[in-house]
Amino acid sequence: MLKQPEMILIDVDGTLVDSVPDLTFCTDTMMERLGLPLRGETKVRQWVGNGVERLIKRALVDNMEGEPEEDLYQKAETIFLALYADNTSKRSHLYPGVNEGLAWLKSQGYRVGCVTNKAAQFTYPLLTELGIIDYFEIVISGDTLPEKKPHPAPLLHAASHFGIAPEKALMIGDSISDVKAARAANFQIVCLSYGYNHGVDIRDSQPDSVIDSLIEIKNLLSQAA
């Protein structure tokens, strides 16, 4: 059973927002401009979750692992970042239950923050345009600190900001990166079943609980000790 938290941090991509449609558009447009084969949404959905740099590299080599030639990567990154700046939220959407779940958390007085590996230049427009930025008292992006998830630093930074002990904090995410960061920071961790985890069932990573919609956090926390 979960212990009652005082602070809750929530991941963005794959947890609150399905951003794959925009990431696929940018990836395939980048590939087209480079004269390379398009990769499509099914592959992009498997590749997301470790930041834009890894997504671009995976698209270039058509594999989860591997490194493209540096000059090709630099050219691709320039194209992708320009595209994504204009396509952060045009096709992306909130998952069902997100607005309701966030509203409930705020109504109950939880301190709520956002921790993502997405760069700030993309995070703030995305959260703003989807209408959820005001739910968060702090937003920690992938370039806020020298380290990002699965390193515990972003989570511990938020705990310090709120003045709350890590053992009284909860992370809500969707991937093994979120689980690793939470365990290393001594946070509890709840995962959404539908997110981006490279095709692997998130239950295999043994989070404290798994839910199918953010609105289910209401029942989970109502039963917390």
Swiss-Prot record:
Source organism of this protein record: Nitrosococcus oceani (strain ATCC 19707 / BCRC 17464 / JCM 30415 / NCIMB 11848 / C-107)
Listed GO biological process terms: carbohydrate metabolic process; DNA repair; glycolate biosynthetic process
Lipid metabolism found in the keyword field: no
Descriptive protein name: Phosphoglycolate phosphatase
Matches recorded under NCBIfam families: HAD-SF-IA-v1, HAD-SF-IA-v3, PGP_bact, PRK13222.1-2
Phylogenetic lineage: Bacteria, Pseudomonadati, Pseudomonadota, Gammaproteobacteria, Chromatiales
Function: Specifically catalyzes the dephosphorylation of 2-phosphoglycolate. Is involved in the dissimilation of the intracellular 2-phosphoglycolate formed during the DNA repair of 3'-phosphoglycolate ends, a major class of DNA lesions induced by oxidative stress.
Pfam families, per database record: HAD_2 (PF13419)
Cysteine pairs bridged by disulfides in the record: none
Record-linked InterPro entries: HAD-like_hydrolase_sf, HAD-like_sf, HAD-SF_hydro_IA, HAD_2, HAD_sf, PGP-like_dom2, PGPase_prok
Family matches, as CDD domains: HAD_PGPase
Gene Ontology molecular function terms on file: metal ion binding; phosphoglycolate phosphatase activity
